[in-house]
From Swiss-Prot:
PROSITE patterns per the UniProt record, alphabetical: RIBOSOMAL_S7
Protein name: Small ribosomal subunit protein uS7
Any one GO cellular component localisation term in the record: small ribosomal subunit
Entry's Gene Ontology BP terms: translation
Function, in words: One of the primary rRNA binding proteins, it binds directly to 16S rRNA where it nucleates assembly of the head domain of the 30S subunit. Is located at the subunit interface close to the decoding center.
Amino acid sequence: MSGQGTGFSLGEGVEVRPDKIRLFGKWSWVGVEVRDPSLKRYINLKPVWLPHTGGRHEKRRFGKAEVPIVERLMNKLMRPGRNGGKKHLAYNIVKTAFDIIYFETGENPIQVLVKAIENSAPREDTTKITYGGITYRVSVDVAPQRRVDQALKFIADGARQCAFNNPKPIEECLAEELILAARGDPRSYAIRQKEEIERIALSSR
């Protein structure tokens, strides 16, 4: 970022305004916002052309908060083991899914992704505590970083389950999951998982 905060420096005397940087050469980062104040710090919307940081955050605590949120979705898609390391496959899945989202909704796919994460992020969960040799489950608030992690996991799992033993390609499944989650639709796997976790937490208060 340049010292004036007006653009990104590409070298001496060369700057690019953020509104000129488009994800995949198509989608603008301008106007994309996070409505949930607790998640703003952990959803990285810094403009990038190509969401690939090469794992530079790996050895820093909480470094994943600096990874572009689109890349974090790609990383979640590189699971289970048979998909490990297939970043280009995940890249193509997300790129195609974003095209489908735009054709179906007319909205910026980056904003749809952010809404889906906000709606899918559980606010309460349960943890185990032991008193006198007896284990209890108690309700706890979920840290913002974990809320984002859980939301991305649910979205990726929902797309993967939809595409398993199904002629519908995973790109369409991911687009559908993101659209439904952004609307808060209970047909979304991510929304159902969030509500189930919060229901169990409520009963454990």
